[in-house]
């Protein structure tokens, strides 16, 4: 199982690295992939055109990355923003140089149990957001430092806070949200 995950990850990372950085200087503004499905519209489409049916058989792996036994990232869509690849596992957030595969930073996501697959993280305005279980993390994309201004020093218990939220007594419970 670990070998299958490793092979899939290596293949995906190698292909993504070539797709994103093979020769994108003319299209550098479209080389970023900041969220799981590219953008808020979930378009899943890149305008990069360096790889097509005429040259796909010439691809070779440039580098690979082994996250470790504890970090299952088999179903993660890596993000690529400004030459940095971000990978979010069940237990760790990684930042890698997308051209070389060199690890730039890693941060633990250690707030409790994390069941089920991890689908990926999101990048916005110099921040990387990742989740584990019912908790959300925010990191500075350049340094990996937890963002002190987000939640409890970079960590937010989303479900716990949502379940304990008290609406004011004057909240109109009989109004349809669309009419508000």
Predicted regions and their residues:
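N-terminal secretory signal peptides that target proteins for export/translocation
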Residues: 1-8
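Bacterial N-terminal signal peptides
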Residues: 10-23
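Aromatic (tryptophan-biased) beta-strands that constitute blades/sheets of beta-rich domains
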Residues: 27-69, 102-111, 145-168
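Repeat-blade elements of multi-bladed beta-propeller folds
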Residues: 32-37, 71-91, 114-136, 168-180
């Amino acid at each position: 199982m670990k070998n299958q995950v490793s092979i899939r990850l290596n293949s995906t990372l190698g292909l993504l690295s070539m797709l994103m950085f093979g020769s994108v200087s003319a299209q550098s503004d479209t080389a970023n992939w900041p969220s799981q499905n590219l953008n808020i519209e979930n378009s899943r489409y890149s305008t990069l055109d360096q790889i097509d049916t005429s040259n796909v058989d010439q691809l070779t792996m440039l580098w690979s990355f082994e996250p470790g036994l504890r970090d299952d990232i088999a179903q993660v869509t890596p993000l690529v923003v400004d030459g940095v690849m971000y990978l979010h596992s069940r237990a760790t957030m990684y930042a890698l140089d997308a051209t070389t595969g060199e690890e730039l930073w890693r941060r633990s996501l250690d707030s409790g149990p994390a069941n089920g697959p991890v689908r990926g993280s999101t990048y916005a305005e110099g921040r990387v957001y990742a989740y584990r279980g019912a908790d959300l993390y925010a990191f500075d994309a350049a340094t990996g430092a937890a963002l002190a201004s987000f939640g409890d020093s970079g960590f937010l218990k989303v479900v716990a806070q949502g379940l304990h939220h008290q609406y004011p007594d004057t909240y109109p419970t009989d109004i349809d949200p669309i009419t508000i």
